[in-house]
């Protein structure tokens, strides 16, 4: 089974399974295909978190493929520029090392059965030959073209004559295909060192950022112990911080104390309880989720049923919390 938001990405994952790949191979193939077909949502320039269940050992491992901020971007620099409290959403300082490529390679190397060249074949083919753009993707693509691509270095590679592709139009991305081929041939080193790394650092610096080639060359994924809780006797697993999966576990712990089964799934009463539970969970995640090397969250306390009971008492049956903390 392969499930994504895009049929062509599903087809990429299924193709890999038919070639003898396993879930790890198919997941990376589907992610790469989504990079091609839904570039407004995901891509090799982002991060990668993954949970993998090994049936032979009955163990779950968590891959943290997120990238760090540039080494030179310290608090003093942000304070000097008046940015210590908040960064504008499209500020070049928000650009971190892209961890997805290493995450893909590491997941396939540790748990996959095929080579990266085989795994990236469907996505490379889509990028080279083109694909019909889906309506919702076209909508968000157009928004991005107006806000960012028009002035972004290399933005023309994601537009057609300066505009976003329309729904149903065939779009090709030869530049992304070349990147995939280099990773297929040279592994993650081809992305984090050499021409690609130089281009990434140069573009970020030209935009006013401080990402350097050394930041990319020093990047590594890490394998972590997953975190979990139980919801009505079913155990749920997530990646630990700095992943955001903690919010889902906190929300389920809070929600477990309500008899939502007695409420219609679409009723205002049930939706209210679900929303308020997650608002409290997101508030905790905003406060506690950070780089665990510098600020480790008290996970045992946060995931305890006693803590969930404390948070649950903040949920009112007939009104919303205006600003949960």
Sequence positions of predicted segments:
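Noncatalytic scaffold domains of N-terminal-nucleophile
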Residues: 1-11, 15, 21-186, 191-193, ...
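Flexible, polar/acidic helix-loop-strand segments at domain edges
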Residues: 246
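Internal maturation/activation junctions in enzymes
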Residues: 257-325
């Amino acid at each position: 089974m392969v499930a994504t938001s895009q049929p062509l990405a599903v087809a990429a994952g299924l193709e890999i399974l038919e070639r003898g790949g396993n879930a790890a191979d198919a997941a990376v193939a589907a992610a790469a295909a989504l990079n091609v077909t839904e570039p407004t949502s995901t891509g090799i320039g982002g991060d990668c978190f993954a949970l993998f269940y090994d049936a032979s050992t009955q163990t779950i491992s968590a891959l943290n493929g997120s990238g760090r901020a540039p080494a030179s971007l310290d608090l003093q620099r942000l304070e000097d520029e008046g940015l210590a409290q908040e960064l504008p959403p499209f500020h070049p300082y928000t650009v971190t090392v892209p961890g997805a490529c290493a995450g893909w390679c590491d997941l396939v190397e540790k748990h996959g059965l095929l080579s990266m060249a085989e795994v990236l074949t469907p996505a490379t083919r889509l990028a080279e030959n083109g694909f019909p753009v889906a309506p919702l993707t076209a909508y968000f693509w157009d928004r991005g073209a107006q806000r960012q691509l028009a002035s972004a270095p290399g933005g023309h590679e994601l537009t057609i004559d300066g505009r976003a592709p329309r729904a149903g139009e065939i779009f090709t991305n030869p530049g992304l295909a070349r990147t995939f081929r280099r990773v297929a041939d040279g592994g993650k080193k081809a992305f984090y060192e050499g021409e690609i790394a130089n281009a990434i650092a140069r573009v970020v610096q030209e935009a006013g950022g401080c990402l350097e080639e050394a930041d990319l060359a020093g990047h590594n994924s890490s394998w972590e112990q997953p975190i979990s809780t139980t919801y009505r006797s079913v155990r749920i697993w997530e990646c630990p911080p700095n992943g955001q999966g903690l919010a889902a576990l906190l929300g389920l712990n809070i929600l477990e104390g309500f008899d939502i089964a007695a409420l219609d799934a679409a009723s205002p009463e049930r939706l209210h309880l679900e929303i308020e539970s997650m608002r409290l969970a997101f508030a905790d995640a905003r406060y506690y989720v950070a780089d665990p090397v510098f600020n480790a969250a008290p996970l045992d306390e946060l995931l305890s049923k006693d803590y969930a009971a404390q948070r649950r008492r903040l949920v009112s049956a007939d009104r919303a919390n205006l600003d949960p903390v």
